[in-house]
């Protein structure tokens, strides 16, 4: 029986496949090969060079002072490059390859893998997880990356596999060559196509979810990551926030780090955001919702304060006169007197 080799491009995807294989959710002779590096970020000009990739990560991490602890380090990256190439070289002509992708990171990883395999005569299938919608009762779920798939649903996505023919293979390799020639540090999927874009591509999204009053940095990061159709690393968004602070579009308060740091949009940031009318509309809608939420919170807060004052006044009613009670509780004399009518005191 032919062996099926699933090639994926994120740690979360690898975890799902390993679990599915070890628990026999995936039947038959199946394996998983995993590539770690996120080739959608950083320079790939003139090809993938591990030392250049490491240099870029070192620079990126050094500049990104308030980046959280990452899931892997440089040693992990080096080891995975070696492991990945070693496992790819062992692929046999009788093996069937499933290349899984959905996000720009996975798309770039897939192109890199296809470039490595281009001189081999292999049976290759592509699986774009965005092509499958999982329905359960009245809920529909569409994964944006392979890492979002639960092990139990892998077979459903695999059913949408399509065989890679020679013409498409050539087109994908040509696309990879064009991307490598671009002097860009960011690649995203736009209208289903992988493209090089400017490094400030996500700046509008960041500003769109940054309020005019100071708010925890994590809230903005979460909104950008959660509401964007394009999957991007939190490290990259952190770095862009730093750049927006440098250019005066965002102001920060507190120590320059993730935990505890607060940010708000500046007038310069609003001018920049206004260049995108749809983004500005979303920012204004969010601001209105925030004001309404704050109004509700203030209402309940005032109700709580009033209850505390009334409770105190009740306790003092038998020992102090109305004027003194009013002074001590902050209630008016009329409110103190009305306690007798409302509460029978």
Question: What is each residue range found by the language model?
Answer:
Residues 1-71:
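A structured, charge-rich N-terminal accessory region that forms the first stable segment of a protein
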Residues 64-111:
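Long, hydrophobic/aromatic-enriched structural stretches that serve as scaffold segments
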Residues 141-215, 219:
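A conserved mid-domain beta-alpha-beta active-site/ligand-binding segment of alpha/beta enzyme cores
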Residues 222-234:
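Short helix-coil junctions and helix-kink-helix linkers
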Residues 245-256:
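A short, conserved structural fragment
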Residues 287, 291-345:
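Elongated, amphipathic alpha-helical interaction scaffolds
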